């Protein structure tokens, strides 16, 4: 306000509820720090008035869930907050449209959720006379299943008859962090013609016991029935088009970032070059020590 008096601004509100498969993907409600708590909106109005700021947009984001009732409730609550600011013309309900990467998961039905939200906006306009432009952010919904990670089997080990058989890959949480961070699952395919299968715990190459690709929603180890593999077998990890390369633990354990290719009309085009060791070391400075 002091730097840009009179500017048009937007603010994010925490509507008091959220949605997600676990705490780490739920970004609304009392346990989430994002946004201004919904009962504190009056303070926003006071600050805006003090600095002659125009609140023209209001934003909320609840996490990654697919329950249309939650979206309906959040839309109603966000519209009620928007009514407090006469200059608001746009309501952004954020993203978080759940995408099923695994066959056991349920994607958000955009038609169902959209109909619920539409009814809320139409009813609100009829009741209050206030019409708002609706914005959403469906980035993950559009891109999650548009990418795959290719890797190899580095090693196969086991912990005895009462333990597990581990399929160790030459990739890990440094490239796909979602399983380690969110206990998320990705489809995994062994590219061979083997008709026999084995129950594997699939793990990454980082020096972390949490670098696992096969865990349940509570982060417990699970096995995945896959084609029986040999060292060197090519592996495809699917569903890597969103929140994978963009939020990877780049250079963790000094592993280089993974090159990226774009498939355009049947032709592969490089969009991120392989990273050389000299590129990782280029940002490091060794000072003269006394």
What are these regions (language model features)?
Residues 105-115, 254-259:
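C-terminal helical cap(s) of enzyme catalytic domains, especially alpha/beta-barrels
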Residues 6-9, 94-99, 279-289:
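Electropositive, surface-exposed helix/loop patches at the edges of structured domains
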Residues 1-90, 99, 111-112, 116, ...:
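Active-site-proximal beta-alpha core segment in soluble small-molecule metabolic enzymes
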Residues 1-3, 19-26, 69-71, 102-106, ...:
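Short acidic, glycine/serine/threonine-rich loops at helix termini
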Residues 128:
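Nucleotide-activated donor-binding/catalytic signature segment of Leloir-type glycosyltransferases, i.e.
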Residues 93-94, 134:
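Catalytic alpha/beta core domains of metabolic enzymes, predominantly
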Residues 12-18, 60-65, 94-102, 139-141, ...:
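Active-site beta-loop-alpha junctions enriched in small/polar residues
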Residues 131-290:
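Charged (often Lys/Glu-rich) extended helix/loop segments that serve as interaction or gating elements
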């Amino acid at each position: 306000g002091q730097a840009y008096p009179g500017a048009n601004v937007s603010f994010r509100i925490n509507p008091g509820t959220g949605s997600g498969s676990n705490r780490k993907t739920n970004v609304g409600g009392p346990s989430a720090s994002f946004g201004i708590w919904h009962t504190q909106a009056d303070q926003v109005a006071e600050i805006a008035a003090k600095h002659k700021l125009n609140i023209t947009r209001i934003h909320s984001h609840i996490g990654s869930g697919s329950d249309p009732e939650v979206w309906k409730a959040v839309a109603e609550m966000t519209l009620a907050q928007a009514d407090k600011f006469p200059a608001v013309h746009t309501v952004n309900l954020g993203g978080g449209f759940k995408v099923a990467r695994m066959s056991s998961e349920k994607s958000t039905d955009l038609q169902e959720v959209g109909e619920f939200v539409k009814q809320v906006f139409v009813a609100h306009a009829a009741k209050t006379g206030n019409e708002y432009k609706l914005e959403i952010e469906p980035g993950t919904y559009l891109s999650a299943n548009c990418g795959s990670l290719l890797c190899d089997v580095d090693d196969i080990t086991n912990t005895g008859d009462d333990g597990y058989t581990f399929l160790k890959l030459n990739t890990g949480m440094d490239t796909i962090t979602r399983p380690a961070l969110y206990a998320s699952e990705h489809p995994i395919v062994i590219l061979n013609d083997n008709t026999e299968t084995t129950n594997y715990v699939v793990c990454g190459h980082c020096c972390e016991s949490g670098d696992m690709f096969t865990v349940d929603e509570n982060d417990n180890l699970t096995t995945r029935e896959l084609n029986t593999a040999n060292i060197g077998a090519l592996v495809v990890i699917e569903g890597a088009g969103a929140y994978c390369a963009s939020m990877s633990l780049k250079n963790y354990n000094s592993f280089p970032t993974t090159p990226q290719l774009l498939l355009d009309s049947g032709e592969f085009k490089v969009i991120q070059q392989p990273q050389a060791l000299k590129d990782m070391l280029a940002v490091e400075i060794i000072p003269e020590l006394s």
